Curated annotation (Swiss-Prot):
One of its GO terms (molecular function) is cysteine-type endopeptidase activity. Gene3D superfamilies: Helper component proteinase, Tobacco mosaic virus-like, coat protein. Residues 109-229 form the Peptidase C6 domain. InterPro entries: HC-pro, HC_PRO_CPD_dom, HC_PRO_CPD_sf, TMV-like_coat, TMV-like_coat_sf. The active site is at residues 117, 189. Its EC number is 3.4.22.45. Keywords: Hydrolase, Protease, Thiol protease. Belongs to the bymoviruses polyprotein 2 family. This is Genome polyprotein 2. GO terms for biological process: proteolysis. The lineage of its organism: Viruses, Riboviria, Orthornavirae, Pisuviricota, Stelpaviricetes. It comes from Barley mild mosaic virus (strain Na1). It catalyses: Hydrolyzes a Gly-|-Gly bond at its own C-terminus, commonly in the sequence -Tyr-Xaa-Val-Gly-|-Gly, in the processing of the potyviral polyprotein.
Amino acid sequence: MMMNSTIRQGWQQVLKRFSIPASGDRLIISNPTDQPIGLFGAFDTSLQTLSQVGDDPEVLKQKIHIPTHLDIASALEASPRSFPWIFLTNSFCTFGGSIHAQNLQAFATAEFKSGFCYMNLLVPLSFDIIDAHADSFRVFVEQLPDMLGAYPSLSMVLNVMLHAATRFPEIVSSPVPTIAFDAESLQFHVTDKRGVPGMWNILKAGRVYELLSLAADGVGCEYMLYPVGAAPQYSFWKKSMDHFTSDRFVEFLAMQNLLASALEQDYTTHDALDALLAALQNAGYTNVVARERRFPNGHDPSTVWLNLSEAPISEKLTDLKRYLLVGHRSDDTADITHNVHQYVFEVLKTMSVQFSKRTNAYNRARFEVNHKVIWNAEYGRGPQQNAELEALVLFLNRQSLEIENILHRTTSPVVVTNWQPDVPTAAPEVSEGEPTHAVATPMTEAPAHATPVEVVNLPSTRSYWAETLVGVLTAVLGTIFALLTRALIRAKRLRRKPTFPWVTLDSGDEDDDHSGGGGGGPQTPGGQPPASPAHRTHQSRLSVQDIASDTSLLSVDLDEDTLSQYDETFQRIRRALFETSFTDILQNSARWISALEAMALADGNAPYTLLAQYLNGIEEAYTSFRNTGHVSRATLSSFFALEDSLRAAGIAFGATTPTQTIQNQFADSPARRWKTRFEQIACELGDASIKSLADLADIIDTERERSDLTQFDVLAASSISSLCRAVRIISDTTDPDAQLALVENATAMQNNINAILGTNVSIPFLSATRRLLVTRRIQQAGAENRSGATPETIQQLADAELIVSEANMFNEMATSQRDIANATQEATIREHVLSPVNALANVGMAAAFFRSGGMRSRALHPAMPTMPGVSAATGRPIFQAFRGRGHRLNR
């Protein structure tokens, strides 16, 4: 069947915009962040099979290399009989499947960009579109990439296929390309003539209706949200690394043997000089490694290669080649052999880590780790790389000893007249003129059997003098920093700084008299009040810093009645905390917090602020728990820390603190038990599920009479009980219309429960009943409207409409779950991030209180009224309210 010319013109426009350009990389699949995740041709057993004819099983196994350099536009504008179609098989029969393969046509000279591979689904469908639908299908094809964009979810792609099957019924039985799935990146790929990426799995759907059936079965599954989007290559390859393609690499042992053999020769003749020069010029290969060619491609990774184009060995080789070419002409014949050996010695020394402390030796691991490149066809090569790196270090150390033995063994060269190097001896034509630059090395491509090695990380060479210098500088800078810090701390101690009202630092003669001698000792509340600024001598000066740090300016004088009211309020707060009376806390928290803030302003005492923050937080946490049934561990931890600080300040708690009460109520919450049982019942099937739901409703009705239920418990009980009864009513109803309405209502109740409880429960009985009722209704109403279609098409379209209904329900559930996720994320940020920060701030305030004199003040006032029936703790200073200078209760 030929493609309609109108549809062909639409594909021409799409390919011009969304196909891989001629200069693009056609051998790799990328994810939305442009990171490579898949490749083609890496493993032959996973390649997609191709077919150019019918169903010949032998031809199905052939792999055909299609040229990709053809111009897409000219190919599409050519005669219809010369279109560049290739026939693929969309089945998995080659890999053990049982479904019969059907050949389908795809582009032979074009591949879609990463992220737009879903367009391959429409290529074989284009051949089955009838002429009456050609214009509509062309518009559909041209608009689809702009509507979906790159990397749409599988759910979006399947919805598009469902829409296409509804508009163009003739494609319901059409074949579709193989869809591959990568378990590593969680991404799908619709294959083209490049086949299945290496190590990817295959989705078992060969036709449109099979694909739509898969969509129906996958409603609510996580993989429906995965994106739909490859030859191996190096990731993170940089432009600065392109020089490696022209660098000359040689096997380390081959170069070592060549140089060792060169040390045994006599160079009094030109033939020996020319032979060594030719051997050095032809040693190794270029084009050993590139972005798309692994180092060293196809070799044993244990083989070590030497880069002759990197310094310092390139410099030593250049000197040796220059001497062999023209440098020897100015020397006596008797000295040439000795001089050649000296140059060879220098080259050997650069190969030894014992002499040079730096090496140009690589294996696969060192190349990839040192240059931070990753071969995208492999995963988890870390342990292998470490082993190869260790092997490289051992190899270089062993060869360094061997090179040292060679140097000692060949101090007296042996004359061997018939010596020939192992490499080709043909020397290049060399001009007799004096060269003006380094001797050039001919470019020799790496043969097919000599493919490069693999990666290892060799530690960079160490300079012990540099390390010693860095250590000394670090010690000096650390000492200077410590001295400066100590000086700043001492200066800060001598400055006037904020203190609590019962501790002041004053200066001057009169201050000394008031403090009982000793300049600037701490003033206790029982002593003389500090002298006013008017009585200070002219020697006592105030600066802007003094004014800013004088906390007495913030103190407030209160009358006796107000102080008495505050004292009574404080005692009520202590009693409520001791008795863990949430009723009093909820009723009076606003008034108590206001009074505590006024106390803190009058007294300047940190425990008042801590207590106000604790009351405010514990009220919010308890209210939130009763309304939502949830409290985070971070919130409880912050309150436990505050309670410890308040205990240290003298606030007594009963046997159970408010935080422990909330924790115990959360652990014993009836709603949590009902939620757990409800989730367990959701996994049951058939009549057992209906009976279990009825039993759960009876249990809830029994426990609803309890008086200690929270608002959340009441809400959960009402919702779950109503749904359980609704399911029972549905099972007893026989009228299909009434039953469908009840199912819709019960489904809405189920979604509401998921939103309230934060669950993702789906009762199988409701889904099965709803599917059965919708199927019956569609079958009854659909046959009359499709009189011209075959029974198979009618059945397939009925299934498609059922999928639409399922997809709509899935979208509603997804929207509900998305709202739950957003609310949960906000609650998590509030409870797990902000609450710990507040807790740390509260602990910091407590620490500031004790560090600034709170303990000294309490030591001067050990007596404090205790709670009824509780004896005061001995041996520990007790916090007492209203001792500051501002309220003047120091009598």
